[in-house]
Curated annotation (Swiss-Prot):
This is Suppressor of tumorigenicity 7 protein. The chain crosses the membrane at residues 15-35, 62-82, 512-532. It comes from Bos taurus. The modification Phosphoserine is found at residue 386. Belongs to the ST7 family. It is found in: Membrane.
Length: 585
């Protein structure tokens, strides 16, 4: 009973809203009716005659001055609107109407309960705007030597931008170096190698670091006669040098895996020694932190090599062990690698368990988290989903949950559906991504498109429902539905991260505002009138009088274009065309 009453109230509310939407048409007809009734007391005909007499006394110079002034004003408005649109990405007139006029006209709900929540949300969104525009390391990034360079050799295009590679160099310096590197010659060489821009110079420096370590081991081993094995452990090979060679010199994934295994032996020894000495001072603590980053990076890349080579179960085991051993290192986002590998195994129950841990309101979201959750819910209903049947009987609870999950994912990153539905071509993902941006969409779709295709009907459900998200967020830059407003900075950052041959997806689409088009048309029209009036003042004056007479006459319904030109000919007294004369011999 209560549900029926609630439904009736909702229908009544929708009817009232609909009636207010079209109330202006009723008001318009009422005004026309009042004007018709009061035409005699208001002396409308006399007033129109007076206006007509006044306009007839105007000279062509007045029209020239009027059109010239309006052209100047329209041109100034056009220039200002164009400058404001280029600088801020929106029309000034539209911005003023949305910010100031729409609240006065009742376009914003001013309930006190909503105001308190929205004010808190706005303050939080201001704090979040900086973090949302932060560039993140792509957890599924490819190998430069084995994948990016091979793409360059085949196509002749550079898949990585200088800005992206510069960010990677900064990450390497942060993860793989510390203040005490100058005490060890090999680490000092690698510290310079990470800053080197030339790839060949970096590779040469890595080989040099390995050779220096080898020479030092050969020289210092004979000095200790007691234990040769202990001395070799004291001087292990440089793990970061192997990392660089595996990333940039190896031309296949198998070669990269061999180098990473050598790096694991060296890195594991350094990690165990620094773990014992980490409490002896800040210098040893920094070394242990660096060795931890190196070890986690190596194990993660080894798991990715196993995934690339088809050993998916082995990769899943390595990722799980790594997450258990280092649970606090969330900066590598290893759970996203784990989700992708579990989807490849079609272990959807395990995927749901991982999502239950990481799809939390207190944790940062990503396209992988949101769209994987949407895929799991779509999987339950997509094989039987039909738009025609849903329109007849309505959506079931499971279908509604799937649609809401898709809307949630699309609101977080609206660029992904175009790549999943193959409406836009994919490129190699960059090494860094911007959350909610086009770069993140490419990185997600590059690895997860196959998983969506594997679930029957999932792409069909996505195709039928994803555009409905935009009806819930008509102003995504100002207010979101489930997330913070969409950040404005994504387009600029994505253009820096993605190569020039890729057309960056922009959301919301920046179409030229109507006011700019209207102003441009008005400016052009008035300028043309001014030019014609200046060149043909008498003809334009007669034409204007004829137009005024037609609009003010009682026979308005019978006018046509021929009557206009007949009046112009009568006023100018244009003589008829001479008849041709035939000469007879």
């Amino acid at each position: 009973m209560a549900e029926a009453g609630t439904g009736f109230l909702e229908q009544l509310k929708s009817c009232i809203v609909w009636s207010w939407t079209y109330l202006w048409t009723v008001w318009f007809f009422i005004v026309l009716f009042l004007v018709y009734i009061l035409r005699v007391p208001l002396k409308i005909n006399d007033n129109l005659s007076t206006v007509s007499m006044f306009l007839n006394t105007l000279t062509p110079k007045f029209y020239v001055a009027l059109t010239g002034t309006s052209s100047l004003i329209s041109g100034l408005i056009l220039i200002f609107e164009w400058w404001y649109f280029r600088k801020y990405g929106t029309s000034f007139i539209e911005q003023v109407s949305v910010s100031h006029l729409r609240p006065l006209l009742g376009g914003v709900d001013n309930n006190s309960s909503n105001n308190s929540n929205s004010s808190n949300g706005d303050s939080d969104s201001n704090r979040q705007s900086v973090s949302e525009c932060k560039v993140w390391r792509n957890p599924l990034n490819l190998f430069r030597g084995a994948e990016y360079n091979r793409y360059t050799w085949v196509t002749g295009r550079e898949p990585l931008t200088y800005y992206d590679m510069n960010l990677s160099a900064q990450d390497h310096q942060t993860f793989f170096t510390c203040d005490s590197d100058h005490l060890r010659p090999a680490d000092a060489i690698m510290q310079k190698a990470w800053r080197e821009r030339n790839p060949q110079a970096r590779i040469s420096a890595a080989h040099e670091a390995l050779e220096i370590n080898e020479i030092r081991s050969r020289v210092e081993v004979p000095l200790i006669a007691s234990s040769t094995i202990w001395e070799i452990k004291l001087l292990p090979k440089c793990a970061t040098a192997y990392i660089l060679l595996a990333e940039e010199e190896a031309t296949t994934i198998a070669e990269a895996e061999k180098l990473f295994k050598q790096a694991l032996k060296a890195g594991d020894g350094c990690y165990r020694r620094s773990q014992q000495l980490q409490h002896h001072g800040s210098q040893y603590e920094a070394q242990h932190r660096r060795d931890t980053n190196v070890l986690v990076y190596i194990k993660r890349r080894l798991a990715m090599c196993a995934r690339r080579l088809g050993r998916t179960r082995e990769a899943v085991k390595m990722m799980r062990d790594l997450m258990k051993e280092f649970p606090l290192l969330s900066m590598f986002n290893i759970h996203e690698n784990l989700l992708e590998a579990l989807l490849e195994l079609q272990a959807y129950a395990d995927v749901q368990a991982v999502l239950a841990k990481y799809d939390d309101i207190s944790l940062p979201k990503s396209a992988t988290i949101c769209y994987t959750a949407a895929l799991l819910k779509a999987r339950a209903v997509s094989d039987k989903f039909s738009p025609e049947a849903a329109s007849r009987r309505g959506l079931s609870t499971a279908e509604m949950n799937a649609v809401e999950a898709i809307h949630r994912a699309v609101e977080f990153n609206p660029h992904v559906p175009k790549y999943l539905l193959e409406m836009k071509s994919l490129i190699l993902p960059p090494e860094h991504i911007l959350k909610r941006g086009d770069s993140e969409a490419i990185a997600y779709a590059f690895f997860h498109l196959a998983h969506w295709k594997r679930v029957e009907g999932a792409l069909n459900l996505l195709h039928c429902t994803w555009e409905g998200t935009f009806r819930m967020i008509p102003y995504p830059l100002e207010k979101g539905h489930l997330f913070y407003p969409y950040p404005i900075c994504t387009e600029t950052a994505d253009r820096e991260l993605l190569p020039s041959f890729h057309e960056v997806s922009v959301y919301p689409k920046k179409e030229l505002p109507f006011f700019i088009l209207f102003t441009a048309g008005l400016c052009s029209f008035t300028a043309m009138l001014a030019l014609l009036t200046h060149q043909f003042p008498e003809l334009m004056g007669v034409f204007a009088k004829a137009m005024i007479d037609i609009f003010c006459s009682a026979e308005l319904r019978d006018w046509n274009c021929e009557s206009i030109f007949m009046r112009v000919e009568d006023e100018l007294e244009i003589p008829p065309a001479p008849q041709s004369q035939h000469f007879q011999n």
